[in-house]
Swiss-Prot record:
Chief place where the protein resides: cytoplasm
Protein name: Caltractin ICL1e
One Pfam family, short name: EF-hand_7
Entry-linked PROSITE patterns: EF_HAND_2
Entry-linked Gene3D superfamilies: EF-hand
The species this protein was found in: Paramecium tetraurelia
Record-stated family: Belongs to the centrin family.
Length: 174
């Protein structure tokens, strides 16, 4: 079967609802492992096994875990889902996340990711931006390690421009 042709999408019953299994290629820019990690996080909140979660409960749980402070980007995505007012399934949850992040292989998607780093609107990624993202992701990197990353990635040695970031993201290693 060619890459353009896809097998019919299988449906599995989940409680009284139907859940559609999507293939990883349905989410450009996400690997199968990344989709699986997102699914595991979603399932933590699907305590009744219905395949659906209430965004209000998800937001409250994330807030109680400090996500509004530790990872405001993800928290705000969940808060936007809350405005819909109905339970969401995994595909809706994944759509919300991927629409915010975009396709990491397109310039537009890479620009969206850049904007997640550039929270101060300086149109560059500086040491403070890297420290914040490192903390949000739970990484334990020293200021020296982050400064070295900047030095290597930035064409001027101080901060990463949008163009520097794009070049880093599209660089392929073999």
């Amino acid at each position: 079967m060619s890459k353009k042709q896809q097998a019919p999408v299988a449906q599995k019953p989940v409680g009284k609802q139907q859940q559609v299994n999507r293939k990883p290629q349905d989410r450009p820019g996400l690997t199968e492992d990344e989709i699986e990690e997102i699914k595991e996080a979603f399932n933590l909140f699907d305590t009744e096994g219905t395949g659906r979660v209430d965004p209000r409960e998800l937001k409250a749980a994330m807030q109680s875990l400090g996500f509004d402070q530790k990872n405001p980007t993800i928290f705000n995505m969940i808060a936007e889902l809350e405005n819909e007012g109905t339970d969401i399934d995994f595909d809706q949850f994944l759509d919300a996340i991927t629409s915010k992040l975009g396709n990491r292989e397109s310039r537009d998607g890479i620009n969206k990711i850049f904007d997640l780093f550039d929270d101060d609107g300086s149109n560059s990624i500086n040491l403070n931006n890297l420290k914040r993202v490192s903390k949000e992701l739970g990484e334990t990197m020293t200021a020296e390690e982050l400064a070295e990353m900047l030095e290597r990635a930035a064409s001027n040695g101080r901060d990463i421009s949008r163009e520097d970031f794009y070049n880093i993201m599209v660089k392929r290693t073999f």
